[in-house]
UniProtKB/Swiss-Prot annotation:
Positions of transmembrane segments: none
Protein known as: Small membrane A-kinase anchor protein
UniProt record similarity statement: Belongs to the small membrane AKAP family.
Function of the molecule: Binds to type I regulatory subunits of protein kinase A and may anchor/target them to the plasma membrane.
Amino acid sequence: MGCMKSKRRDPTQNSDSSEKVDGKPGKHGEKAVLVFSEIGSMEDSVRINPVLLDYAQRLSEEIVARAVQQWAEVDSRYSDIPYIECDVP
């Protein structure tokens, strides 16, 4: 199951029909639609290539490692700058 957003305006659509999850009105012209996966997903998972899964796992680990390294470098570069709170609301 997933969620897709559509920013197209439908002239026949009510302007009150776009609501957020918390019940507050959302932006006009946006609509969330649930998308259900197919019933036979267990059969599809058997056909996944293990080499492809291994590659995807290594790639995702590399991306996370690079992101953590980049965060650590930026954090160490700017850690000596004090945080100044603003008194103006």
